[in-house]
Amino acid sequence: DIRVIFASHQDPDICSSLAMWLDLNPAIKTYCSWLWTGFVSHFSTGEVITLNPIPDQGMRIRIGDEGPEVEAVPAHYCHSSGNFSLYDPTAGILFSGDIGGALVPDHHASLVVTDFEQHIQYMRGFHLRWMPSTVALRGWTQRVRAIKPRMICPQHGSIFEGEMVGKLLD
């Protein structure tokens, strides 16, 4: 019973399945940065996808007609110029997209980060290559500190919770 799709940014690992989801349920509301609406609308099997643009400052997104709201948190230039994380204030969970992502070998993989110093080696290369702007990352960390998530869930790698949230933001 999917009602909303949130595309954190324009990459195919986020958007390439949109057409299939919309074929299953054309009523799904799809949100992405205004910057990428023209680009992402072409991830279709024929018809152009209609998207709900997210302004640069972010926005609240209602899940369904009377459901809870989640917040699109700006993460611009943290991998993509029109990038957002998604915060669920009810659960206290921030879905960070690629921020905090890691390429963890199978023999070290775990659902949750328990040793930040061990884990950072799997994050370093990706972040240096795809998120080289410390100014952009500082802006994101300030916004995230203000909302105080109890958990940060990147789309690649392990989850940060408890004290590991603070270590990631530091």
What are these regions (language model features)?
Residues W21-L22, V40, V144:
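Broad structural signal for hydrophobic residues in well-ordered alpha-helices, predominantly aliphatic
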Residues L22-L24, L111-V113, L169-D170:
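Glycine-rich, phosphate-binding/catalytic loops in enzymes
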Residues A27-I28, E161-D170:
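Short acidic, glycine/proline-enriched helix-loop-strand junctions
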